[in-house]
């Protein structure tokens, strides 16, 4: 019982006690009334009408000891009332066996006087006197301790507690009969009153004599103050349970649903989460308390005193004047926050949902993203979580990073954070759509800053990237708006994609639109599919592609085969995409996690791979009918461009016939992803190359892609966080919603790569064979790609292709087997040869970026025509040089291929390039389904291809040196080292690399425009010079950054090596000097120079040389010459755009024109190394494939080593593992997270200190005012029985 010293009204000792506690200690000198001078003495304590009797001290010799207490209710001692009411009477009696008890003496104490004189407590001896009117005798003394107490209950409370006390004997009898003890608490006891006993003080010792005699159980009841009032607490607590309603705020539900619906909401949801944790903690606590209490009350009728454990009772209950504080409730609330399941409120569920999406982004959302659009969801989560927790934010950016490379990862993580923050900021004020638009414009502008030509291309976010990607070219702005609308429509899908990111293919679709700005506007309506994909329906995605892009994508495959006789492989490819696409559908659902894990690195490669397939098909088609296929291809490309909006997944994808690819691509990616898990790394490289090839062939798309790529680059360059995303984001940039899809597509691409890669490989090989002598090199590219894919397919197609293009294939196999690097170089070689065509595409893309989109189609046609007939745009004049280049690459890769063969290869490769363009178009249309999935990876690869494009130029120059490239492992190590270096020089290197990449890109573009001849050469020279400048400017940073880029794209070192080699080789044809400038110091290195040597010098060149090296393989010498010329020319035309693109990593990737490069890959064993390096990111899949071709066990070993490298960089966690949420975080993000948690802990510690101080102060006050509360009585007072 809380006793207060001061009544609050009086001062000092002038306070009115409400109770007096009388403890009868002992007596002495009593008269003997029993036998032998003994007496059986007991004392009766009475105040007013209340009496208590002590126990009988039997046979005491005149000095009984009782030490029993009784508590009496006092009238106001300060009021003038009858003295008897405030008089304490102590009577000592002898218990007689017969008759009345004998009187031994009596003492009376005036409590008023005692209180006035002695204050609160007094222990003294009182002399026993005789009854009034009798003669006084010596009766002895009694020692009594009298303590005045104040119970602060209000009068009404006290009255309630005392109300039913019987005042008359009959009432007492009734109470006895009923078993009621006055002492025991009455049923009407108020919530606050501990017990109905008059003695409410904490001591409660002098409650009952009768109780003792009659019922110890009752005494216990009376002693436990709160036992009798089970409802008391529930009563006081009940009101608090109402806050529960607060839990059901529309905002809470809205944020939960909105989170699913769109990123803005997801971020708001995360905000809600954060709010919940802070401000909502109270609500939660209350809610939880409410929930808990209601639950407890439900279980234990209003909860009784047990509610003490409940947060509610503790939070709001004042028990006996003691307040229960919310400290524990808060803790409970926090606990509930962490485990929302405990709270039944929707808010609790929502919170749970939020947590799973944010923290369990890693676990729950990540699982979905892993399955569907890990990256997007990561990103979205990161955005939403940025406010709530770094965890989620980091995860989004981190996930792509691990896939891309440590280097890219770190760069991307910052970028992602920035993008996320920016996105969040824009999203908060604006609606999801407006925010998307603003993000598009804002981020695109940022990207523009990086690469002026492609403002829209920069995907601030994956969504933004998608939207931006649409806008890359002249059409980019319009498509971007359309894409924005579409993204708005599909924002929920995109958001869910980003948040849940279940549908990679979804994003891929969005990405595809970006890929083909011209046709984007029309295809965008098809992009509605992204929503369906949001449900992770890869096939729905395909449906959308066919519906929205049926004319483009489906027609592309159809047209391809019909219009391109050589497209048997193309149709095969188309079928492959379908197969792969369907398989991907199955696999996408089955192995979403694989997608997420492989998505980043493999996605890009896969995209490339698909293009490669198309290229090999093109080779065949070209061999059969180059001119016609080219036109159909161009048409297909155009159509494909139209569908691209739907595909949106990848400019390359659209270039490759994205129309049919978008959904299939996703499926393919899924299937391939699984297949690729083993051979993914190798496959990825080859796929990347392939993708690049198709990309180049379809200049028109590339045009759009180019702007888009710059966007990607911008995104990529802008922030490392975004950069991580960029691999996908790049893809997204190109393809509207690629980012999330990028991840999914990446994962899916892997699967697709495996399947599509294998199919395409076989087809490409067939095409290469059809292409004949020129294809030896060119075919070698397809064969390498095939090798990669076949490796995916367990070498089935590879064997065929190997047989067909045994020279190239075996060499590439040897290269891969002997050196994963060599294999990569070969792939690069293939790319190099194809990049020539791609270069035209890039050149056109650059031009388109500058506002020459038409040129891109023209370049495309020209490319094809120039393949057939050295035309103005493509390889016309450079046709022989291109072929020659290819041959030199082949010669380097394969000594056996003669220069003359290279010459013939020149023409044929050029044709093949044209045919490839046509086939690529057709294949793209068909592959566009899985390309849609690959599209994101393609975009990613395009990012790589942006880097590669310059690399392609460099490759054209240094292709021969590809064979000397280090092994895959070495490259990986180098890339990792470079990545580390780049991370150190991250920003500078990035800028340098991007710039160089842009220049390289420009160079690459000119390559495609070989047909332009001298003008192209001049452009390329200009670009080469620019590249040289860029590379020279940032040779160190560039080396680091290119290495980083290469690491990111797996092409850095390879293309470097190739760059030097190509540079030298190009000098042989006509662009040696020009190529050298492109190489940026790589030119001087001999063709045999290992990629590693060039790596430091021409980082962008490295990247692009890898790509170019493939085209070089196909058109090694010729390509070099033509590349030099056309690159010069294209450099002049697209120099600004390319520089911009290069400034942005995405543009560099765009420059990557994998398709051309892909074919020559097998042509050059040396190139394989460069390619592998180039594929560092993609390379892993390529290396795995190449190794597989030569040696399945070797391929497995390579894959394992590469996987181990990845795992070393990032330990893999199961999505169900709580650590998964943090596994994707970058170092910086982890640091931020730790700092944030530290801050939170410090805040909590501060709160704890405050509470502790409060408790200490409270204790001090209690000790000062009511020390008896804390005092443990030395003598355990017995309760005197009530009479």
Curated annotation (Swiss-Prot):
Modified positions (Phosphoserine) in chain numbering: 184, 202, 206, 234, 300, 315, 339, 341, 343, 345, 356-357, 382, 435, 477, 529, 545, 758, 1135
Low complexity compositional bias, start-end: 588-612
Gene3D superfamilies: 1.20.5.2440, C2 domain (2.60.40.150)
Ranges that cross the membrane: none
Localization: Recycling endosome; Cytoplasmic vesicle
Record domain FIP-RBD: where: 1211-1273
Name the UniProt record assigns to this protein: Rab11 family-interacting protein 1
Recorded name of the encoding gene: RAB11FIP1
């Amino acid at each position: 019982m809380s006793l207060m010293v001061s009544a609050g009204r009086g001062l000092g000792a002038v306070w009115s006690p409400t109770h007096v506690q009388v403890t009868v200690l002992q007596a002495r000198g009593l008269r003997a009334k029993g036998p032998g001078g003994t007496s059986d003495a007991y004392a009766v304590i009475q105040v007013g009408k209340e009496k208590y009797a002590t126990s009988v001290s039997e046979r005491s010799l005149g000095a009984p000891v009782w030490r029993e207490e009784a508590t009496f209710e006092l009238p106001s001692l300060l009021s003038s009332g009858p003295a008897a009411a405030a008089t304490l009477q102590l009577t000592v009696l002898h218990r007689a066996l017969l008759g009345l008890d004998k009187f031994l003496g009596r003492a009376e104490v005036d409590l008023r006087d005692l209180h006035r004189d002695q204050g609160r407590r007094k222990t003294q001896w009182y002399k026993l006197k005789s009854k009034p009117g009798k003669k006084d005798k010596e009766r002895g003394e009694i020692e009594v301790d009298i303590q005045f107490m104040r119970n602060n209950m209000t009068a009404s409370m006290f009255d309630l507690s005392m109300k039913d006390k019987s005042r008359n004997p009959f009432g007492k009898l009734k109470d006895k009969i009923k078993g009621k003890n006055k002492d025991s608490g009455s049923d009407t006891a108020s919530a606050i009153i501990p017990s109905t006993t008059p003695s409410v003080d904490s001591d409660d010792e002098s409650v009952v004599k009768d109780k003792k005699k009659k019922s110890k159980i009752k005494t216990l009841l009376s002693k436990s103050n709160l036992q009798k009032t089970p409802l008391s607490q529930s009563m006081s607590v009940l009101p608090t349970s109402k806050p529960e309603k607060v839990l059901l705020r529309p905002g809470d539900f809205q944020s939960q649903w909105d989170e699913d619906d769109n990123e803005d909401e997801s971020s708001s949801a995360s905000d809600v989460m954060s709010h919940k944790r802070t401000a909502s903690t109270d609500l939660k606590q209350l809610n939880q308390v409410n929930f808990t209490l209601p639950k407890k009350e439900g279980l234990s009728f209003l909860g009784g005193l047990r509610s003490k454990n409940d947060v509610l009772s503790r939070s709001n209950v004042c028990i006996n004047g003691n307040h229960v504080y919310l400290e524990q409730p808060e803790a409970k609330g926090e606990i509930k926050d962490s485990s929302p399941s405990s709270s039944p409120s929707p808010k609790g569920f929502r919170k749970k949902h939020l947590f799973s999406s944010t923290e369990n982004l890693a676990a729950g959302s990540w699982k979905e993203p892993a399955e569907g659009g890990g990256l997007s969801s990561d990103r979205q989560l990161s955005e939403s979580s940025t406010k709530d927790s770094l965890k989620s934010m980091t995860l989004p950016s981190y996930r792509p990073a691990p896939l891309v490379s440590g280097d890219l990862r770190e760069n991307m993580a910052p970028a992602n954070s920035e993008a996320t923050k920016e996105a969040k900021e824009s999203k908060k004020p604006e609606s999801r759509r407006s925010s998307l638009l603003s993000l598009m414009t804002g981020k695109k502008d940022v990207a523009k800053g990086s690469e002026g030509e492609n403002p829209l291309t920069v995907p601030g976010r994956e969504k933004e990237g998608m939207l931006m990607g649409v806008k890359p070219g002249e059409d980019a702005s319009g498509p971007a708006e359309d894409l924005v609308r579409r993204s708005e429509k599909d924002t929920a899908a995109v958001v869910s994609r980003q948040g849940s990111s279940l549908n990679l293919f979804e994003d891929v679709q969005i990405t595809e639109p970006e890929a083909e700005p011209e046709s984007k506007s029309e295809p965008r309506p098809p992009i509605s599919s992204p929503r369906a994909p949001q449900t992770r329906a890869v096939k729905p995605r395909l449906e959308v592609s066919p519906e929205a892009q049926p004319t483009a994508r489906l027609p592309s495959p159809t047209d391809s085969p019909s219009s391109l006789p050589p497209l048997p492989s193309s149709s095969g490819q188309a079928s492959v995409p379908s197969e792969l696409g369907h398989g991907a559908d199955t696999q996408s659902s089955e192995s979403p996690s694989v997608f997420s894990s492989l998505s980043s690195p493999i996605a890009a490669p896969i995209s490339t791979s698909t293009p490669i397939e198309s290229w090999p098909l093109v080779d065949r088609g070209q061999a059969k009918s180059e001119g016609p296929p080219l036109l159909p291809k161009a048409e297909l490309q155009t159509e494909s461009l139209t569908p691209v909006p739907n595909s949106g997944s990848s400019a390359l994808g659209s270039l490759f016939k994205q129309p049919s690819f978008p959904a299939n691509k996703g499926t393919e990616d899924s299937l391939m992803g699984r297949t690729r898990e083993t051979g993914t790394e190798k496959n990825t490289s080859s796929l990347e190359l392939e993708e690049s090839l198709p990309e180049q062939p379809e200049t028109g798309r590339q045009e759009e892609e180019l702007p888009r790529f710059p966007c990607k680059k911008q995104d990529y360059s802008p922030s490392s966080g975004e950069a991580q995303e960029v691999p996908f984001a790049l893809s997204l940039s190109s393809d509207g919603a690629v980012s999330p899809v990028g991840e999914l597509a990446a994962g899916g691409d892997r699967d697709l790569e495996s399947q599509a890669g294998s199919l395409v490989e076989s087809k490409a090989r067939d095409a290469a064979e059809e292409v004949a002598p020129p294809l030896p090199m060119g075919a070698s590219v397809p064969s390498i790609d095939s090798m990669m894919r076949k490796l995916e397919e367990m070498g089935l197609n590879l064997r065929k292709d190997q047989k067909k293009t045994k020279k190239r294939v075996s060499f590439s196999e040897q290269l891969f087997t002997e050196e994963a690097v060599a294999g990569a170089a070969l792939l690069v070689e293939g790319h190099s040869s194809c990049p020539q065509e791609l270069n035209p595409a890039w050149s056109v893309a650059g031009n388109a970026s500058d506002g020459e989109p038409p040129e891109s189609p023209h370049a495309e046609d020209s490319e094809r025509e120039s393949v057939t007939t050295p035309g103005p745009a493509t390889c016309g004049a450079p046709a022989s040089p291109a072929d020659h280049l290819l041959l030199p690459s082949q010669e380097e890769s394969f000594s056996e291929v003669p220069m003359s063969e290279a010459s013939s290869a020149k023409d044929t490769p050029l044709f093949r390039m044209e045919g490839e363009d046509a086939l690529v178009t057709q294949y793209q249309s068909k592959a566009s389904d899985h390309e849609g999935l690959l599209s994101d990876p393609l975009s990613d690869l395009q990012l790589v291809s942006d880097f590669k494009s310059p690399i392609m130029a460099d490759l054209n120059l240094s292709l021969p040196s590809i064979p000397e490239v280090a092994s895959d492992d070495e490259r990986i190590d180098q890339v990792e080292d470079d990545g580390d270096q780049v991370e150190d020089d991250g920003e500078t290197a990035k800028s340098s690399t991007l710039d160089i990449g842009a220049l390289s890109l420009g160079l690459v573009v000119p390559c495609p425009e070989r047909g332009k001849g001298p003008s192209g050469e001049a452009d390329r020279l200009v670009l080469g010079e620019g590249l040289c400048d860029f590379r020279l400017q940032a040779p160190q940073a560039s080396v680091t950054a290119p290495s980083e880029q290469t690491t990111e794209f797996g092409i850095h070192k390879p293309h470097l090596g190739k760059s030097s080699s190509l540079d030298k080789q190009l000098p042989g044809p006509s662009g040696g000097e020009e190529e050298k400038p492109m190489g940026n110091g790589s030119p001087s290195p001999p063709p045999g120079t290992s990629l590693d040597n060039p790596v430091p010098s021409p980082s962008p060149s490295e990247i692009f040389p890898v790509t170019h090296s493939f085209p070089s393989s196909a058109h090694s010498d010729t390509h070099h010459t033509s590349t030099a010329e056309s690159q010069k020319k294209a450099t002049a035309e697209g120099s600004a755009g390319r520089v911009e693109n290069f400034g942005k990593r995405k543009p560099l990737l765009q420059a990557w024109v994998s398709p051309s490069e892909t074919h020559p890959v097998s042509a050059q064993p040396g190139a394989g190394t460069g390619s592998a390096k180039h594929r560092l990111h993609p390379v892993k899949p390529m290396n795995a494939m190449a190794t597989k071709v030569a040696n399945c066990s070797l391929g497995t070993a390579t894959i394992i080593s590469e996987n181990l490298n990845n795992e070393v960089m990032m330990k893999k966690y199961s999505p169900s593992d709580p650590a998964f949420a943090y596994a994707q975080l970058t170092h910086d993000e982890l640091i931020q997270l730790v700092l944030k948690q530290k801050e939170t802990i410090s805040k909590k510690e501060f709160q704890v200190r405050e509470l502790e101080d409060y408790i200490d102060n409270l204790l001090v006050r209690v000790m000062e005012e009511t020390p008896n509360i804390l005092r443990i009585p030395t003598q355990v007072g017995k309760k005197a029985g009530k009479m």
